[in-house]
Swiss-Prot record:
The gene is uppS. Belongs to the UPP synthase family. Its cofactor is Mg(2+). Mg(2+) binds at D27, E214. This is Isoprenyl transferase. It comes from the Bacteria. It is an enzyme of class 2 (transferase). One of its GO terms (molecular function) is magnesium ion binding. Pfam families: Prenyltransf (PF01255). SUPFAM superfamilies: Undecaprenyl diphosphate synthase (SSF64005). The lineage of its organism: Bacteria, Bacillati, Bacillota, Clostridia, Thermoanaerobacterales. PANTHER family: DEHYDRODOLICHYL DIPHOSPHATE SYNTHASE 2, DEHYDRODOLICHYL DIPHOSPHATE SYNTHASE FAMILY MEMBER. Keywords: Magnesium, Metal-binding, Transferase. The keyword Magnesium applies. One of its GO terms (biological process) is polyprenol biosynthetic process.
């Protein structure tokens, strides 16, 4: 019945009006586990299945860019045991999934301050990016140790260095200058941002890039997020008239 409903929903989609870039704030892993009387870390493990499904669904539907908010600059405040588990889970996910992603022509990129992550994570990240860099299909950005404010600060610092080195004049700095110094330089801004778990805020996610993004919030907890929920978000997106500040 679920697959039948998915097919009915897909038929409603206008394939000519799909977003190029979808961003997802993957929220609710801990609550998913707690509702089942399990430690929070089990929710993170269950969330990997949702990551796998949403990547497959975006490929099938023809989405070109997908950005997943996996670990924020603020998440270091969580208990050490939980942070350590998340880092181990990242290594496990990449070691198991990257060959399949590569086979499916997916480009894997990581955005955020990767230098602060454990060395074992950095090694797997480097392997994944190198293996998939020449692919031409869906681009998956995984935001790790990422914060929108931090990204803007780092972009500003790099621009200031260019001004000091006389590579750039202050008068020539434009919005596009800042855009080209962000982690997502050369990619389109997200057309649609999805947040699971019922929370209704951006939580420091793609702050510069989301200026004109459509926002879709769902009560569904991340481990329960399926293809049909993604299609519901896309159908909502297609009801919106995007004016970008115009009439």
């Amino acid at each position: 019945m679920i697959f039948f409903n998915e097919e009915k929903l897909i038929k409603k989609l206008d394939k000519t009006r799909l977003p190029q870039h979808v961003g997802i704030i993957m929220d609710g892993n801990g609550r998913w586990a707690q509702k089942r009387g399990m430690p929070r870390v089990y929710g993170h493990k269950a969330g990997v299945n949702a990551v796998r499904e949403v990547i497959r669904s975006c490929r099938e539907l023809g989405i070109k860019y997908l950005t997943l908010y996996a670990f924020s600059t603020e998440n270091w405040k969580r208990p050490k045991e939980e942070v350590d588990f998340l880092m181990d889970l990242l290594v496990e996910y990449l070691s198991k999934e990257v060959d399949e992603l590569n086979k499916n022509n997916v480009v894997v990129k990581f955005i955020g301050d990767i230098s602060r992550l454990p060395e074992k994570c950095q090694i797997e990240i480097e392997k994944a990016q190198k293996l998939t860099e020449k692919n031409t299909g869906l681009v998956v950005n995984i935001a790790l140790n990422y914060g929108g404010r931090d990204e803007i600060v780092k972009a500003t610092q790099n621009i200031c260095k260019k001004v000091l080195n006389r590579e750039l004049s202050p008068e020539d700095i434009t919005e596009d200058t800042i855009t080209q110094h962000l982690y997502t330089a050369s990619q389109p801004d997200p057309d649609l941002i999805i947040r699971t778990s019922g929370e209704k805020r951006l939580s420091n996610f793609l702050l510069w890039q989301s200026a004109y993004s459509e926002l879709w919030f769902t009560e569904v907890l991340w481990p329960d997020f399926k293809k049909r929920h993604l299609i519901e978000a896309l159908l909502y997106y297609q009801t919106r008239k995007r004016r970008f500040g115009g009439v």
